[in-house]
């Protein structure tokens, strides 16, 4: 400790330490100092345990938003704590840099996607550094860099060689005016192109897929291993994989040798089938449609082809269809059943055909009601029967009726018997089906990772000979026609690596999820020019110990990353099954929002003259006021730069961490930001006092013990808050309690006081790293506070020598005395009876009974006069 420092500033290792809290000056100074000292550089492997802290990397839009700030601040606090607790920590950052916005910028602004992207990366990198985030910038990755995407291409070839990458026809969104393929996000709610306004068509194009379905069962089963993930995320993934156990059943087409094959999870209802539905795109539609129905069927199929899959399968959307005029035979009953086509059946899912059982399925019941189809019940409740006509479908287990030889069985028992009977008769077989479909990775875009395939007339698709297959520079963008790559004949024309004959490059690029499905592996060996990662390094650092990101990535990104990990494990490239041990899905940052309920329009807060009675300045209507996720369209965002300019990064970090538990939504409140700034100023003034008073011996032993207890109570509670669930907000509350205890301490300069101030700064450092560093140097620290060990808990300091004891007379509190914490019942009773309080109230009274509650109170019951 260094005491008696009365000058306004002092020197610490060549860095000036100011005695006035100026956050902007302090933060700039220490950020430069840390960078020069490479304080956050990842250590090489040693005997210490490892900890890999990871935030989901951002798309480089050019500006940070508060959601970014929250995500990265949470992860940074965790990483800083783990470093101080003796772990060697990997904490890196990169950029998910391919994607549609860069192409849109190229079209709208006439700039090259690479120039626009790298400019945004540079801008956001500086913004991240201003937050004091402890990243090892030597491990930075940018997915649009050839140094990165050559390995994305190499990994694609690993899938290709394993038979997990293939091409097939698939439906895409087609803009008939611009003559180009659109991503789903480029199609508005009315099914029109966002740029041309054309009604989007659905077309078939040859696309590349990864066979994720080969891993469906393992992806599902291994969710049980992920005990460090939120239960709702595991459930979302399980539902997305969508395992269904049931059977294939085959219905012979009347007057044909072909059959309609359906999958059902309810074979027990097969006797109640009253119609069969094909997807409009099903290959059998043409065959089963009668001449009389051809016009209606063709018109309906054309209409459905313009409807998105999302619309077709929406739960609240009425299901529509038309009859084909054809029939199948129910092999179980021998009855003819009509064949329909309907919009809710998708050709890509299952067999593209379903059996309709209105009596026992809600969707089928609604469809039957709409089109007057018969309802044939084949399962009754175990107790009693349902009167006909059935008011609603019966979807629970029950007893079989109207089901031939299976009548009287429980529906659960009948399932297995009906499947066995179908297998015996050649009508079907048991089957497990998954909702999960193979991953379509083709994008008809320029700004993506090129697929490293050459198409040869003789050899077919062949892996490119040399990687990376680089994107060409200086491409012209019009927003019309095929992908810009497909229009570059010099780039497309190449030589087959196998036979040497003329061939053409694949012009599709990869889904950006391909790049983000393995970036966490690259961080382990980010500068290696020879390989994506070495096995030693990836197995040393992985799996990620703590992953932090938004719930919006709960399914696709996390599922694809898990898939990548399992495939690369099977290719012998790594030795673990799952990429992320623990997952924290931080809540959204919400802003105060003003909305006119009559017009539905949002009003910016700076147009509100009286926030206590907000009205629309244009109409005079009273506005609704509520918190909602920050967005530009709602005018409720807060620019992080504004907060940093006014209060500094440490205040922003403290507010973000204190306002709400990490997993809960956070409501932005300027008053609370101001409150955190005031708290840091209190800590600043406290340290100024501690650094300028002379060290003394303790004059009051009890006060000294009480303060030591407060300090070690804070260490214990703070550490426990961070240990399991990262309750960062309650950890900061402990800092506030400790600050109050130190401010109230009667003996500044005593050993417990000075130790307490040191401890406060050490605990504050992961959350507010700049001010903590400055204050640590003012307290005489000889090295960075971020290199200091974690405060050590002294459990003996928590022992309480004396406790308060309440004295009650007839249940009414009359006062409190101090007693030894070790006193037993008899001693407590005697101490209470002998106290001045009891003597005063019991004088002349007869004690009838004494109630002792150890550690709390003694109650004297006296006789009535």
From Swiss-Prot:
Q: Which UniProt keywords apply?
A: Aminoacyl-tRNA synthetase, ATP-binding, Cytoplasm, Ligase, Nucleotide-binding, Protein biosynthesis
- On whether Aminoacyl-tRNA synthetase is a keyword of this UniProt record, the answer is yes
Task: Give the record's GO biological process terms.
Answer: leucyl-tRNA aminoacylation
Q: Which residues cross the membrane?
A: none
Q: Which reaction does it catalyse?
A: tRNA(Leu) + L-leucine + ATP = L-leucyl-tRNA(Leu) + AMP + diphosphate
Show the GO cellular component annotation of the record.
cytosol
Instruction: Report the residue ranges where the short sequence motif 'KMSKS' region is annotated in this entry.
Output: 629-633
**Which residues constitute the signal peptide according to the record?**
none
**Cystine pairs:** none
Question: Motif ('HIGH' region) spans which residues?
Answer: 58-68
NCBIfam families, alphabetized: leuS_bact
| Protein name, UniProt field | Leucine--tRNA ligase
Gene giving rise to this polypeptide: leuS
